[in-house]
Amino acid sequence: MTRIDLNSDLGESFGRYTIGNDDQVLDLITAANVACGFHAGDPDVMAQTVALAETKGVAIGAHPGFPDLGGFGRRKLDMTPAEVKNMVTYQVSALMGFTKDHRLHHVKPHGALYNAAAKDLALARAICEGVAQVDDQLPLYGLAGSQLLEAAKEVGLPAYSEVFADRGYQADGSLVPRSQPNAVLTDPLAVAERALSMVQTQSVTAVTGETVPLKVDTICVHGDNQAALALVDQLRQTFTANGITIQAC
């Protein structure tokens, strides 16, 4: 039986600013990547999001990012490996403190940190070492085929291969930058059919037409996407209709 995890980046509101449809999205996903206050979120939002996820039985993961609130963590900052390691440990520990049993299901880096670590092994290793300082058995979610997954293997962390239902792919398996056309997909039916194909064929078609092989353990739909709720709902319907069980990794 085929099983797939559906995850979403949540807890990204802060102060008086509300981002996303967290309450509704949590009814449809199996794992939540919760912002840890650096790129988005704040202590109150972190506490509220964790409590809500626990109530709904959704697996909770830390979503650390660069300290870039103004840029939503989508700008790469020049930091040493030691700084990245400590930054990740800090954020993961902070979110863990809000959980009932002080345990997390996984860690998934955010935005520019995630994308840079997909290609930069030294940066990826620093992230994994930061996670391991908190819990050396805490699983990592990383882009399929990326250096982040390779670093997790080197450091000894469990890892799951992630794909994106609502993002365009380049021929090398990286995501199309948000500044370019076809970077973000919003049509629920098209996204669901594409995701189903990814699961069934373990591959994706790049925006330039190439077939890119990838391993699919978990699928991300972005919570800050205006179509997020409709996308996740359609994904569930499509997977269920095709005999795919939706379950956290």
Swiss-Prot record:
InterPro entries named in the record: Glyco_hydro/deAcase_b/a-brl, LamB/YcsF/PxpA-like
EC id: 3.5.2.9
GO biological process: carbohydrate metabolic process
Top-level taxon of origin: Bacteria
Pfam families: LamB_YcsF
Keyword rRNA processing: no
SUPFAM superfamilies: Glycoside hydrolase/deacetylase (SSF88713)
Keyword vocabulary terms for this entry: ATP-binding, Hydrolase, Nucleotide-binding
Catalytic activities: 5-oxo-L-proline + ATP + 2 H2O = L-glutamate + ADP + phosphate + H(+)
Recorded GO MF terms: 5-oxoprolinase (ATP-hydrolyzing) activity; ATP binding
UniProt function note: Catalyzes the cleavage of 5-oxoproline to form L-glutamate coupled to the hydrolysis of ATP to ADP and inorganic phosphate.
Subunit composition and interactions: Forms a complex composed of PxpA, PxpB and PxpC.
Family according to the record: Belongs to the LamB/PxpA family.
Protein's UniProt name: 5-oxoprolinase subunit A
